[in-house]
Amino acid sequence: MSKKGRVLVAMSGGIDSSVAAVMLHEQGYEVIGMTMKTWDYANLGGSKKETGCCSLDSINDARNIAVSLGFPHYIVDIREEFGDYVINHFNKEYLDGRTPNPCVLCNTHIKWDSLLRRADKMDCDFIATGHYAQVRSENNRFVISKGLDENKDQSYALWGISQQSLSRTMFPLGHLHKTDIRAMAAERGFMDLVNKSESYEICFVPDNDYRGFLKRRNPGLEEEVRGGEFVMEDGTVVGKHEGYPFYTIGQRKGLGITLGYPVFVTEIQKENNRVVLGREEGLNRNGMWVDQLIMSKYENLKGIQKQSITKVRYNDDGTSSTIEQVGDEMRVLFHEHVKAIAPGQAAVFYEGNDVIGGGWIKSSFKQD
């Protein structure tokens, strides 16, 4: 074994994870590559793209990098556990009138757990991924912080990783920009990686048609929920909709209703199959409750009011807020209005570039 240690690298076949593996190999680590097959397009009725996540082409791309550098590469089939946890949860959340974030679930409960189990079997000291984030040890805690490249930062999707997992995690790309990664790949002759398009879709909904996914996943759902009422915030019925699972908070397009002015989905009421509509200002909230907390920088914040920049979705710049842990939940008071807070999405709290912790949005509120 290398003096620096043995590291198991998650390799998707994309440029980021491939360059992460290359960097660690060149730094003298004993690298083992692992590609996780999480699902397949045909069984789930999605697009049958040959170059997407988990495709044969992507698996071969990862293997070719390993072969060219002389380190072993393994393929691990985790479709069953991915389906049982991530896909079933995604489906259930929409049926509960919430808006899920499967990537956070996958990172926390599937990728890291799978990597660490295999790492232990292979006597690996560390695991590594191609995420744009950083991790460090401070005050007996392992702290996640933003990647140097703000445009590519992925810390929002990593808040759910446990302290034990973080203690063995490496993010080789955290201190680099995407332009650096492309340059490194080009310098080493990996032009296929440089020219490879990136995917920003949910991997098991590759056509981005979550409505179609739900219909395929739940035969008879469409008939069961069709015909519910669109109502205004004062309860006035203004039309019929296709079923509450097919709408999300903040949605404006695809409502199929014309009122003479723009309206948005402000609330989803599963219990009576109602979708509440309102003007844009009706999306404004200045507080929320977050549950299922996992803390990074601090063990807990019980009884402590702390200033934070809080993100309520992936592409959110964040909003200044005061957070206070109450029992097992976080009460968040924003210093200005935030639009379209969707229950089921992840909320992540930042102190500077550091992740304080995160959880799942339970509910939002508006107070004077």
From Swiss-Prot:
CDD domains associated with the record: MnmA_TRMU-like (cd01998)
Catalytic machinery residues: C106, C203
Keywords annotated in UniProt: ATP-binding, Cytoplasm, Disulfide bond, Nucleotide-binding, RNA-binding, Transferase, tRNA processing, tRNA-binding
One Gene Ontology cellular component annotation held by this UniProt entry: cytoplasm
One Gene Ontology biological process: tRNA wobble position uridine thiolation
One Pfam family in the UniProt entry: tRNA_Me_trans
Catalytic activity: S-sulfanyl-L-cysteinyl-[protein] + uridine(34) in tRNA + AH2 + ATP = 2-thiouridine(34) in tRNA + L-cysteinyl-[protein] + A + AMP + diphosphate + H(+)
Site (Interaction with tRNA): H131, Q345
InterPro entries registered for this protein in UniProt: MnmA-like, MnmA-like_C, MnmA-like_central, MnmA-like_central_sf, Rossmann-like_a/b/a_fold
Primary location: cytoplasm
Disulfide bonds: C106-C203
Annotated signal sequence range: none
SUPFAM superfamilies: Adenine nucleotide alpha hydrolases-like (SSF52402)
Localisation per UniProt entry: Cytoplasm
One GO MF term attached to the UniProt entry: tRNA-uridine 2-sulfurtransferase activity
Residue segments, region Interaction with tRNA: 152-154, 313-314
Residues that hold ATP according to the record: A10, M11, S12, G13, G14, I15, D16, S17, M36, G130
Similarity annotation: Belongs to the MnmA/TRMU family.
Function: Catalyzes the 2-thiolation of uridine at the wobble position (U34) of tRNA, leading to the formation of s(2)U34.
UniProt name for this protein: tRNA-specific 2-thiouridylase MnmA
UniProt gene name: mnmA
